[in-house]
Amino acid sequence: MDVNVGGTENIIEMCKEHNVSKLVYCSSTGAIPEEEKGSIRECEGSIPLDPERIKGCYSLSKAMATNVVLKAAKEGLNACVVHPSGILGPEDFAMGETTKTLVDIINGEMPAGIDGSFNLCDVRDLADGLIGAADKGKSGECYILGNEPVSFKDFTKLVSEESGCKQMKFFLPISAANLIAKILEKKAKKTGKKPLMTTFSVYNLARNNRFDSSKASRELGYTTRSYRETIRDEIRWLKAVGKIA
């Protein structure tokens, strides 16, 4: 909260103090309350901070920070917000969670998948979307930068086809994955080690991942490349830097 909310408040104050021409805040699709069915679109005005609909401390902190930015925009600051979905693509030197999942699948270190879905934008498309928001984004507006949802099963199939690794055969139902995650979280509390799977990560696979990026496409010129292209390019990069054989 101190970084995502307090830090955002500090940045806004600095923008005002130094007459910054524009602020683009990078939020998250996790900050938008989930709709059970249909496509999920940007919130208008402010995000309703309903803990029943915004899951996880990170997402809640992003929602709170987004509201801080939108409030500042109403007060005259030239500021807009982008909501990226999950991020995938080459040159992830920090080895984020999605890249780590990709590497684990290729190296055979993930014995089973989960019967859920992702929504992942290519980091290069995200970068273009951020530039588009800086150039064309309207003050006080929010823009989703996502992709089409892809099932875990289809994702692993693409990884197998592009890397040559064995195709994953077993996919846990969400209910079973959630039960295992709860057990792993309890064990992690005792050992102090990070659990292999969390109830929050299971939720992110089980939730509605149909984020609508049409507003960003219309107003910012946002485009997305195929999952196959992103996965192929990331695998090439991972091989080049020695992360996979």
Task: Briefly describe each language-model feature range.
Residues 2, 6-56:
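Conserved Rossmann-fold NAD(P)-dependent oxidoreductase catalytic core, especially the SDR/UDP-sugar
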Residues 53-81:
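Active-site Tyr-X1-5-Lys
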Residues 31-33, 77-98:
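Flexible, glycine-rich beta-alpha linker
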Residues 10, 64, 97, 114-135, ...:
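Substrate-positioning beta->alpha
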Residues 36-45, 94-104:
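Short, flexible, mixed-charge acidic loops at enzyme active sites
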Residues 129-196, 213, 218, 228, ...:
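Mid/C-terminal beta-alpha module of Rossmann-like enzyme folds, strongest
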Residues 49-53, 100-121, 125:
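A conserved pocket-lining segment of Rossmann-fold NAD(P)-dependent short-chain dehydrogenase/reductase
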